[in-house]
């Protein structure tokens, strides 16, 4: 009975650690479930009963972001809109537009092609000097359509360099060894559009900017930070701007300016641009060769092209999303309907938030007369379910690492060598996961993950640190345990028994 009480503090520590880990991993799940649920609700019925304004108001209410704005846009501007939170006040809030910047770059390149300064078949090396090996034979078309063979490596993009041109960054790029021949397969990579920005800078001899009449701004624009998810709550996102990355993700502006850009794409000028873009587009399906232009899903000059069935007919659709930590944008265009849906939100992080693009798709389908998609309770894509699962798993892992450390400090392992081996193996596995596993799965380093999903990054670092410290504690304890002969324990027990008997005899 006495020994049971001696080891009770260890079990109490274990229980406390597991309880904290369980609470940490599950406290945020109700909020996360709300975030990853498709917010369709009764939007379809509201829109049909009360019109576009009522439907937009319901959508904005259901999305429940710190700042959100959604609009239906025609060639002449906004037809209907609803704004809430940070995006409803004055003066207007400006945010970075993320990858919607690619369409602006595409229109800039298309204008240079129309003027004869560029050709789709031109090789990168003909316009940009100081290229590292492997880049010079990539064509302008391959860059525009993501068929260059370049991989999506955010270690080379999304850097805070507000005063640096793309031309200055190009010589610092790593040597490129394509896994497949240039032009043979689609692989989305923002690096393509950084290189296109360098092409425009070289051809024009001027700093990179949007085409005339397009209201987008570079790093001189002051933007709001926005928010990223943090254990079911929100925390401010870090502020940064990549002037070498305006072409792929760092143009910005207000919601009004974003709707103006959507209207530009419905104008006569925009329709000419999209005719060029669609004609040069490449299939995005992994199993489709780049030469197969019969596929519906295509990528052109910074835009996705496909079709959607709604109202008993098939509609052409042009769309793209944009995201930086703390901000999300999306434009969805139905050119045959002469309307577009535009959405901006001042909160975004990865993984998760898939309800934002899905809601825009849902709304555009309704406007075209389509039937609402049944609400399955989960958002489109892998981000939404992965986020709470990863958060819960890492919380339990962190608690387990804490338990291991407590046992090393306070416990009395009978097999110290085994405890040391287990701790060392766990430590090595956690370090490998932190250094190699996270980048392999997410494409982000731990530091970069901290911008998109700080709660995941915090738990990953904490669990690894606790495991490593536990291994060191096991090593220290193992080094302090003196070697004993096999019968040492029995001898010690007999000595204590005799000493106890002698003591009893002297007291009587």
Describe the predicted segments one by one:
Residues 1-36:
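Secretory targeting and sorting signals
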Residues 2, 34-73, 242-498, 504-508:
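Catalytic loop of the DD-peptidase/beta-lactamase superfamily, centered on the K-T-G motif
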Residues 38-47, 91-96, 127-131, 156-160, ...:
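Second-shell loop/turn segments in exported
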Residues 44-98, 114, 118, 122:
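Short, conserved catalytic-motif segment at the N-terminal edge
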Residues 46-50, 94-99, 137, 185-190, ...:
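Short, solvent-exposed loop/helix junctions and linker helices
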Residues 50, 91, 96-100, 112-155, ...:
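Active-site helix/loop module of the DD-peptidase/beta-lactamase fold
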Residues 104-105:
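Active/ligand-binding-proximal structured segments within catalytic/core domains
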Residues 154-259:
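Catalytic-site signature segments of enzymes, centered on catalytic residues
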